[in-house]
Regions:
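Short helix-coil boundary/hinge micro-motifs
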Residues: 1-46, 74-75, 79-82, 138-160
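Short, cationic Gly/His-enriched loop motifs
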Residues: 47-160
Length: 160
């Protein structure tokens, strides 16, 4: 990516406060709930990247992520927190490593109440609601937890 594209990318990110907060993508969102970012190709065309993959490319470099998956430790499809430290939320790895991590965190059980409501359309709707809320009111960890990760605190009233 060129410097203009990198600057344009970071203009679409709202960083949550604190060392463990997500950095939320507030640009385009695809029908799967993941952010979308377009860059120019060398032949004058365009290529579309998922926003978290674009963040990993910016921080780690194209070679580091070629033929690898970029996955989320935070389970937030809008998170683009790529860092060269333990605070980063994105991991680079293989499909097999991602499946092991998925099982370890209990995401492999499709009957788990935390994940069973999160089909493709529901995930996209939640992501768009979180983007709208963040743009209107700023970063809100409770909304990240409820809308994207499906975590509802005891006694918490619904947003809508």
């Amino acid at each position: 990516m060129n410097p203009h594209e990198i600057a344009r990318f970071w203009e679409k990110v709202i960083k949550g406060p604190g060392p463990s907060a997500c950095w939320l993508w507030v640009g385009a969102i695809g029908d799967d709930g993941y952010g979308r970012f377009w860059t120019q190709t060398t032949d004058g065309g365009q290529r579309m990247l998922r926003a978290h993959r674009a963040a990993a490319e910016i921080i780690y470099g194209v070679k580091a992520i070629t033929d690898q998956l970029v996955t989320h430790l935070c389970d937030n499809p809008l998170c683009v927190r790529a860092e060269n430290s333990r605070e980063g939320h994105l991991l680079i790895g293989t499909h097999a490593e991602n499946m092991i991590e998925r099982e370890y965190r209990g995401r492999g059980n499709l009957h788990n109440p935390l994940w069973k409501h999160q089909g493709r359309a529901a995930r996209a709707t939640s992501a768009r609601l979180l983007r709208a809320h963040t743009l209107a009111y700023g970063y809100d960890q409770h909304q990240v937890d409820e809308l994207v990760r499906g975590i509802i605190m005891p006694g918490q009233q619904p947003l809508f």
